[in-house]
C-alpha cells in the first residue's frame, strides 16, 4: 500500500566510507532544491540523519524530509518501490533501490562503474578519485 500520495524521490547521502560520499559541498542541497522545484517531495532514507568521525560529519541535506532511522528493511523497500526514482552513492541502499526496479541515479567515483549494477544514470568523474577502492595495491586499513 502506498502511504505517500504525492510524487516523491528517495535519496541516500551516506555510505560506509567517507571517500564514497559525494564530497561536493552544496551538491545535495542543490539537488534537493531542484527536485522540490519540479514538484517532488524528497525523502532521505539513510539509517542516520548525521554520521561521521572527528571533524568530518555528514548531515541530511537541507530541505530533505527525514525518513532516517533503524527501519525494518521492508519499510525501506516500501518507500523505494513507490518512489519516482532514487539518487544515492555506492551503498547498500542503492542496491536495494535497484532491486525494487525503480530508476537509480548512482553517484560514484571511489568504485569503478563495473563494480556495481548497470544504470544509465551514473554520475562519474574520471578526473578525480576514480576506482581507488578497486585497486588492490591501496591499503585502506
Locate each region found by the language model:
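Mid-sequence helix-capping/hinge segment at a functional interface
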Residues: 1-21
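Leloir-type glycosyltransferase catalytic cores
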Residues: 1-2, 119-141
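Short regulatory "switch" loops immediately downstream of catalytic or recognition motifs
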Residues: 13, 44-56, 133-141
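Active-site donor-binding loop signature of nucleotide-sugar glycosyltransferases
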Residues: 13, 69, 109, 125-127, ...
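Residue-level signal for pocket-adjacent positions within structured domains
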Residues: 17, 62, 127
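A broad, structure-centric signal for solvent-exposed, well-ordered loop/edge residues
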Residues: 18, 74, 114, 130-131, ...
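Donor-binding and catalytic core of enzymes assembling or modifying cell-surface/extracellular glycoconjugates
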Residues: 22-115, 120
